Amino acid sequence: EKDKIYGILFDGAWLWEEYLNTILKPCGFRHPENKSQKGGLKMFQKDADNETISKNSRKLYPDFWKDDFILDAKYKHLNNGVGREDLYQVVSYMYCTTAKNGAYVYPYEKVEDPVSYQLSGYKGIIHVAPLYIPQTEMIFEDFIAGINGSEDRLRNFLQSKDN
């Protein structure tokens, strides 16, 4: 009995996406369900082309999107930069949807401003936006106030770029 270990496993990346959905949905972002193949975007203009070129009915499933914005939820720090595959994925989604903005949102333990980078070509912009998660609050109400402020900062930033 003393050597037993009890625990729970969960998909932190999935939970992070669902949490972000509560913040982003009121801003008009859609959250496709790639596992159930709902809400995907077309890669090609003609449906027949999806089958002809790939034999796999290519659909795009960004974590979040709206008219001129692609957003990727990352449950990892991006302070050392965005990984190559992550970058190519968002740029591809932006290109296929002609979105001017792409963003990565990730949890962070400090308050930091988002950083923006202009792409070559059609001049889209990639934003790297840390979402501050309060770490030191000892009272639940203080944590709630801190996280609400973080959520508001993220919403305000994204809405300021969506013009």
Residue locations for each model-derived region?
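Catalytic core segments in nucleotide and nucleic-acid processing enzymes
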Residues: 3-163
